[in-house]
Structures are given as C-alpha cells and as structure tokens.
C-alpha cells in the first residue's frame, strides 16, 4: 500500500536522478540553486529589482496552480493563500489571469 504524507510546512520538488530514482527536496533548495545559476550568468554585473523578479517567477505559477486547485473560486483561493480576496484579485489582474 502507498502512503502519501503532506507536510504543510515544507514544499518539496520531486527530481529524478541518473538511476531513475525519484527524490524529494525542499523547494527552497531549488530556488537557491536557480539563484546561484542566475548570479553565475550575471558575470559580476549589477542587477536591479531582483526581489520583484524572483517574486514574479514564484507568484504567477503559485496563483495559477491555486486557481486551478480551487476551480476558479477566488474566495477559497484567497483563504488557502492567507490573503484578502481583494489582494488576490489585484494579483490575478497584475498577471492577466482575471
């Protein structure tokens, strides 16, 4: 029998290694690796608005998946995300998801 455990405190990413084994690692590790790669590509150049760039990269797919999960129910989506429904509507509009 398979057992699925959900830890609401840690988001994980499933990865497949060269031996086709699936492993789970915290999402923050993937974000950290993506940022390391990004900084390596900058080659010492300065960057502006990094916070907004990273936030947009995470926020848009988060909104998309939550809206899919709630079947478009904005009240339920806002509750899941812990934000006000008006804030959710603004964010959806920002990304053209309204």
From Swiss-Prot:
Keywords from the named record: Activator, DNA-binding, Transcription, Transcription regulation
Residue ranges the UniProt entry marks as DNA-binding: 74-93
UniProt xrefs under InterPro entries: Fis_DNA-bd, Homeodomain-like_sf, HTH_Fis, Trans_regulatory_Fis
Keyword ATP-binding: no
Top-level taxon of the source organism: Bacteria
Keyword Signal: no
One of the record's GO molecular function terms: DNA-binding transcription factor activity
Matching PANTHER family: DNA-BINDING PROTEIN FIS
Subunit details: Homodimer.
Family classification: Belongs to the transcriptional regulatory Fis family.
Stated role: Activates ribosomal RNA transcription. Plays a direct role in upstream activation of rRNA promoters.
Record's protein name: DNA-binding protein Fis
Source organism: Photorhabdus laumondii subsp. laumondii (strain DSM 15139 / CIP 105565 / TT01)
Recorded name of the encoding gene: fis
């Amino acid at each position: 029998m398979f057992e699925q455990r959900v830890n609401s405190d840690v988001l994980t990413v499933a990865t497949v290694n060269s031996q086709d084994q699936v492993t789970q690692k915290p999402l923050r590790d993937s974000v950290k690796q993506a940022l390391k790669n990004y900084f390596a590509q900058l080659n010492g150049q300065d960057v502006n608005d990094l916070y907004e760039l990273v936030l947009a990269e995470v926020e848009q797919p988060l909104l998309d998946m939550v809206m899919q999960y709630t079947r478009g129910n904005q009240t339920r989506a806002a509750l899941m995300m812990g934000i006000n429904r008006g804030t959710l509507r603004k964010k959806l509009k920002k990304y053209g998801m309204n």
